[in-house]
């Protein structure tokens, strides 16, 4: 999984515990030997476990980890536990819980979307965009990968993807061949993706032979027409669908013959419920 630096882990912790735990201190519980455990309430995919472990170790807590990143577990499964002083465990509690809940939620949605797509087309690929909640992209990426998903692009420097907002600034916004030719010259090692807003644009793009045409917010009927036009043109161009694609409708697009699905839906999934219990050491 992804590497998280000490600074990133510190940021997670300091957001919540920059002045310690007032309640634990006021109750005089700080030095009491205690044990903490984290359980997944519902069956599903686990994500964020490696980050949770590192967060605990940052607080000099040495956890016992029972599952792996991306593993499917049954309801009520124990994910990790640790022993330590009550003040350390209470400082770790909420940060670790939130990382696990949010990561598991993203991973669960991703896994369900992949399953729905692959039930129709085993070659289907679910790729998540950079349209994540601000400051959560790395956590989200880690969760998507844990669930078996792919990353569409992490940032602007990774792929060549031409939007209408790029073309609006060109002297000839519809010179598709000129756009593709220039990109091949300037970035010869990268695949070229053009995004089509409608079928007219799509048909024009076919003549330029990009590697991929991304169909943005196309209805099922429009996708069907696009596939027909592609077949008539006899072009070896990959079609992807983006904009509004989610776990509820991905199978319908897959039935048409699409196998590359671009989505940000997993980032907005409901968090999974992680039960946390802190008790005195026996």
Curated annotation (Swiss-Prot):
Keywords: Glycosyltransferase, Transferase. One of its GO terms (molecular function) is nicotinate-nucleotide diphosphorylase (carboxylating) activity. It comes from the Bacteria. The keyword Glycosyltransferase applies. The keyword Phosphoprotein does not apply. GO terms for cellular component: cytoplasm. It is an enzyme of class 2 (transferase). Its EC number is 2.4.2.-. InterPro entries: Aldolase_TIM, ModD, NadC/ModD, Nicotinate_pribotase-like_C, Quinolinate_PRibosylTase_N_sf, Quinolinate_PRibosylTrfase_C, Quinolinate_PRibosylTrfase_N. GO terms for biological process: NAD biosynthetic process; quinolinate catabolic process. PANTHER family: NICOTINATE-NUCLEOTIDE PYROPHOSPHORYLASE [CARBOXYLATING], PYROPHOSPHORYLASE MODD-RELATED. Belongs to the NadC/ModD family. This is Putative pyrophosphorylase ModD. It comes from Pasteurella multocida (strain Pm70).
């Amino acid at each position: 999984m992804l590497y998280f630096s000490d600074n990133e882990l510190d940021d997670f912790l300091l957001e919540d515990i920059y002045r310690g735990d007032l309640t634990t201190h006021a109750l005089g519980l700080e030095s009491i030997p205690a044990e903490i455990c984290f359980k997944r309430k519902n069956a599903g995919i686990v994500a964020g476990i490696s980050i949770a472990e590192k967060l605990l170790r940052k607080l000099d807590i040495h956890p016992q980890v029972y599952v792996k990143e991306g593993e499917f577990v049954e309801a009520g499964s124990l994910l990790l536990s640790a022993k330590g002083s009550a003040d350390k465990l209470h400082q770790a509690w909420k940060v670790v819980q939130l990382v696990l809940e949010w990561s598991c939620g993203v991973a669960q949605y991703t896994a369900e979307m992949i399953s729905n797509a692959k039930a129709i087309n085993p070659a289907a690929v679910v790729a998540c965009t950079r349209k994540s909640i601000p400051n959560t992209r790395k956590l989200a990426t880690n969760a998507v990968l844990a669930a078996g998903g792919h990353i569409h692009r992490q940032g602007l420097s990774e792929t060549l993807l031409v939007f209408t907002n790029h073309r609006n600034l060109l002297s000839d916004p519809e010179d598709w061949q000129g756009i593709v030719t220039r990109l091949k010259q300037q970035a010869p090692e990268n695949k070229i993706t053009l995004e089509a807003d409608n079928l007219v644009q799509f048909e024009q793009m076919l003549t330029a032979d990009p590697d991929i045409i991304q169909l943005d917010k196309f209805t099922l009927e429009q996708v069907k027409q696009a596939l027909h036009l592609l077949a008539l043109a006899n072009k070896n161009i990959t079609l992807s669908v983006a904009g509004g694609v989610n776990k509820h409708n991905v199978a319908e697009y897959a039935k048409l013959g699409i196998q590359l699905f671009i989505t940000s839906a997993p980032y907005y999934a409901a968090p999974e419920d992680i039960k946390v219990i802190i008790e005195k050491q026996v």
